[in-house]
UniProtKB/Swiss-Prot annotation:
GO CC field: mitochondrial intermembrane space
Chief location of this protein within or outside the cell: cytoplasm
Biased composition (Low complexity): 134-144
Lineage: Eukaryota, Fungi, Dikarya, Ascomycota, Saccharomycotina
Gene name as annotated: DRE2
Protein name, per record: Fe-S cluster assembly protein DRE2
InterPro entries: Dre2_N
Single GO MF annotation: iron-sulfur cluster binding
Length: 313
C-alpha cells in the first residue's frame, strides 16, 4: 500500500536547500513505498493550492527558524488536521507551546512531540433487556396448566386483566367521625366510659350545652378577677357583669371616658406649648375715624381742583 506524504515547507527554507534534501532522503529510507507531495505553506493558506481532505498519511513540516518563531495560527492547525487521514501524523518543526491548541483542534500529542489525528470513537448504546414476568405454576406452556388471573399464555400481564385485578382490590373503609362522637357521648351518659380518648375533633359541629356553660363560667371568672380585657367583646363583658346602681355606672363611665378640659389641663401641667388661636382683626372706632378723615380730605381736593378749573377757564 502506497503511503501518501506531504512535505510542507516554510518560505524561509529556500535559504537552505540541503535541509530539504536531507529530509527527503530520510523519508525514503523510512518508507520505501511512498508518494511525496511538496508545497509551500503560504500557497495553501492563501488558497492558491487546494488540497483534498483526508488524503495524507503523514505531513512533514520544515521551518528553519528559531523556536520562538515556530508559532502556527489556529486556522492552519485545523487545516492540517483536515488534510490528514485517521491515524495520520504531523511531524517536523512544530511549536512546543501549542500542544493545547492542537488538542483543541482534534490532535493527540505523541511521546516524540508529533501530533496524531485519532480515529473517531463510535458511540455504542447499551439497551437494557426487558425482564419477562413469568408468573406460572408450571414451566411448560400447556393451556391446561393453572395460571394466575391477569397473565396471558406468554406469562406477561395484560391491560384488561390488570384492570380486573384493580377492580377486585378491596377499598379501605373509614368510620365517620360523627358516629364516633355520638358513640362517645352515649358511653359517657351510661357511665361505661369515664372520659373519651383523645382524637380528631370536628370544628364545624355546633357547641354543646356543656361547652356553653363552661364558657360562661370562664367569662364570670374573668370578670371577677378584673381580666375583662381578655374577653371576646364588650358585649361579653356586659353579660357577666352584675347590675349595680346608677351611681356606680356613672362612676365607671368617669373612669372609662376622659373630659376634654381635663385633657387640656394635663397638657398645660406638662409645660407643653399650645399655639395661639388665629383671629382676624376687628374694625373698631379708630379704623372708622381714619376712613372718615380720608374721605373728607378727598372732598377738599376735589373742590380745590374745581375752583382752579373755573379760574383758568
Amino acid at each position: 500500500m502506497t503511503l501518501r506524504i506531504l512535505l510542507l515547507l516554510h518560505p524561509t527554507v529556500v535559504s537552505d536547500q540541503n535541509l530539504v534534501e536531507s529530509v527527503k532522503s530520510k523519508i525514503s529510507a523510512e518508507h520505501p513505498n511512498h508518494s511525496l507531495d511538496q508545497q509551500i505553506i503560504n500557497r495553501i493558506t492563501q488558497g492558491d493550492v487546494v488540497l483534498s481532505n483526508n488524503t495524507y498519511d503523514e505531513i512533514h513540516y520544515i521551518n528553519p527558524n528559531d523556536s520562538q518563531y515556530l508559532e502556527m495560527p489556529i486556522l492552519l492547525i485545523k487545516l492540517l488536521n483536515d488534510l490528514l487521514t485517521h491515524d495520520g501524523v504531523l511531524r517536523g518543526d512544530l511549536p512546543k507551546d501549542q500542544n493545547l491548541d492542537a488538542l483543541m483542534q482534534g490532535f493527540v500529542v505523541g511521546d516524540d512531540g508529533s501530533w496524531i489525528k485519532p480515529k473517531p470513537v463510535e458511540t455504542v448504546l447499551l439497551l437494557k433487556k426487558k425482564k419477562e414476568s413469568n408468573i406460572t405454576s408450571n414451566s411448560n406452556n400447556n393451556d391446561s396448566s393453572p395460571r394466575e388471573v391477569g397473565v396471558n399464555n406468554t406469562g406477561n400481564y395484560t391491560h384488561a386483566a390488570m384492570s380486573t385485578l384493580a377492580s377486585k382490590k378491596k377499598i379501605p373503609m373509614f368510620k365517620k367521625l360523627l358516629d364516633r362522637s355520638n358513640e362517645v357521648k352515649g358511653n359517657l351518659a351510661s357511665g361505661t366510659v369515664k372520659s373519651p380518648s383523645p382524637g380528631l375533633t370536628d370544628t364545624s359541629a355546633q357547641n354543646t350545652d356543656e361547652e356553653n356553660e363552661n364558657g360562661n363560667s370562664m367569662k364570670r371568672k374573668l370578670v371577677e378577677t378584673k381580666l375583662t380585657y381578655f374577653s371576646d367583646s364588650d358585649s361579653d363583658n356586659n353579660e357577666g357583669r352584675d347590675l349595680d346602681d346608677d351611681d356606680d355606672d356613672g362612676q365607671e363611665d368617669n373612669d372609662i371616658y376622659i373630659n376634654e378640659n381635663d385633657l387640656i389641663s394635663e397638657l398645660k401641667s406638662d409645660n407643653l406649648i399650645i399655639p395661639k388661636k388665629c383671629e382676624l382683626p376687628q374694625w373698631g372706632k379708630g379704623a372708622e375715624r381714619h376712613v372718615r378723615t380720608v374721605r373728607v380730605g378727598l372732598k377738599g381736593v376735589v373742590k380745590e381742583a374745581g375752583a382752579f378749573r373755573r379760574q383758568s377757564g
